[in-house]
């Protein structure tokens, strides 16, 4: 962040009429105290800005006026070529601004202090260990069933986003959205039981690096299989039933539920 330092020398104040004259379209008529030389009249010489080594006592408005003046110089209609380049102002910016780091001690859920970085995504299909595919049955419900032939195209493609969360050697936080749809798997409490649902989101806001915890799953690799544990409800996993054509749900791995999946990457 750039701030204007307090300086220790007097400079004449500009009033609005002087500023209007200073920024006249024809050309600047005079520049007070800021430059030792500024020659616009000689067609054989380029514009040269010379900065006094003595710090000047400028308010922020005067500093901005200087920058606006330079912008006006760029736009002046002159018949002679100028060698005034974009990099020229950099020589005196250090006299006006001081650079300070922006520090953040904590993160909060309203994302006001979170600067999202580009999200790494992987498109994939998931099948349970019985080779049942996941399909979108109702507008907001996934079901697991066996597909073959032309029906194989019905299985959903997930957009797996690698998000912020508690990362360990065997757990990677991810969010699971349905590719091409504004739907994400999320975990909420319903009637006292952790429940898996498909939640509609604003595509302008999602995906993002810091997803709400209900959207986050810990991807756990077990040999050639993967499991997805809810970050909101530890020890509860995305599960399928032993039976055919049953909804995908959140289970607590009691031995009857299927929690192991194979992941098939899909080109984007």
From Swiss-Prot:
GO terms for biological process: astrocyte activation; cellular response to antibiotic; cellular response to fatty acid; cellular response to glucose stimulus; cellular response to interleukin-17; cellular response to lipid; cellular response to lipopolysaccharide; cellular response to mechanical stimulus. It is found in: Cytoplasm, Cytosol; Secreted; Lysosome; Secreted, Extracellular exosome. CDD domains: beta-trefoil_IL1B (cd23296). Induction: In pancreatic islets, release is increased by high glucose treatment and, to a lesser extent, by endocannabinoid anandamide/AEA. The induction is more pronounced in Zucker diabetic fatty (ZDF) rats compared to lean animals. The record marks 171, 179, 190, 204 as: Important for interaction with integrin. SMART domains: IL1. InterPro entries: IL-1_CS, IL-1_fam, IL-1_propep, IL1/FGF. Residues 1-116 form a propeptide. GO terms for molecular function: cytokine activity; integrin binding; interleukin-1 receptor binding; protein domain specific binding; receptor ligand activity. One of its GO terms (cellular component) is lysosome. Keywords: Cytokine, Cytoplasm, Inflammatory response, Lysosome, Mitogen, Pyrogen, Secreted. It holds the Pfam family IL1_propep. It comes from the Eukaryota. PANTHER family: INTERLEUKIN-1 BETA (PTHR10078:SF30), INTERLEUKIN-1 FAMILY MEMBER (PTHR10078). Belongs to the IL-1 family. Monomer. In its precursor form, weakly interacts with full-length MEFV; the mature cytokine does not interact at all. Interacts with integrins ITGAV:ITGBV and ITGA5:ITGB1; integrin-binding is required for IL1B signaling. Interacts with cargo receptor TMED10; the interaction is direct and is required for the secretion of IL1B mature form. Interacts with HSP90AB1; the interaction facilitates cargo translocation into the ERGIC. Interacts with HSP90B1; the interaction facilitates cargo translocation into the ERGIC. Potent pro-inflammatory cytokine. Initially discovered as the major endogenous pyrogen, induces prostaglandin synthesis, neutrophil influx and activation, T-cell activation and cytokine production, B-cell activation and antibody production, and fibroblast proliferation and collagen production. Promotes Th17 differentiation of T-cells. Synergizes with IL12/interleukin-12 to induce IFNG synthesis from T-helper 1 (Th1) cells. Plays a role in angiogenesis by inducing VEGF production synergistically with TNF and IL6. IL1B production occurs in 2 steps, each being controlled by different stimuli. First, inflammatory signals, such as LPS, stimulate the synthesis and promote the accumulation of cytosolic stores of pro-IL1B (priming). Then additional signals are required for inflammasome assembly, leading to CASP1 activation, pro-IL1B processing and eventually secretion of the active cytokine. IL1B processing and secretion are temporarily associated. This is Interleukin-1 beta. It comes from Rattus norvegicus (Rat).
């Amino acid at each position: 962040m750039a701030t204007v330092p307090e300086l220790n020398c007097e400079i004449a104040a500009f009033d609005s009429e002087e500023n209007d004259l200073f920024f006249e379209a024809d050309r600047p008529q005079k520049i007070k105290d800021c430059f030792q030389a500024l020659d616009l009249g000689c067609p054989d010489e380029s514009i040269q800005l010379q900065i006094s080594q003595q710090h000047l006592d400028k308010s922020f408005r005067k500093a901005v006026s200087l920058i606006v003046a330079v912008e006006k110089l760029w736009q002046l209609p002159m018949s002679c070529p100028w060698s005034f380049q974009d990099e020229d102002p950099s020589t005196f910016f250090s006299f006006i601004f001081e650079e300070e780091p922006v520090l953040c001690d904590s993160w909060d859920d309203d994302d006001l202090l979170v600067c999202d970085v580009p999200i790494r995504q992987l498109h994939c299909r998931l099948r349970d260990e019985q080779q049942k595919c996941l399909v979108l049955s109702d507008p907001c419900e996934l079901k697991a069933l066996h597909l073959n032939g032309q029906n194989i195209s019905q299985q959903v493609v997930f957009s797996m986003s690698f998000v912020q969360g508690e990362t360990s050697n065997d757990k990677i936080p991810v969010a699971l959205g349905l590719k091409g749809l504004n739907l994400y798997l999320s975990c909420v409490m319903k009637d006292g039981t952790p429940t898996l649902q498909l939640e509609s989101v604003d595509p302008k806001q999602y995906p993002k690096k810091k997803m709400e915890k209900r959207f986050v799953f810990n991807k756990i690799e077990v040999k050639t299989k993967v499991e997805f544990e809810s970050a909101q409800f530890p020890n509860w996993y995305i599960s399928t039933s032993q039976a055919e054509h049953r909804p995908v749900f959140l289970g607590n791995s009691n031995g009857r539920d299927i929690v192991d999946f194979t992941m098939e990457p899909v080109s984007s």
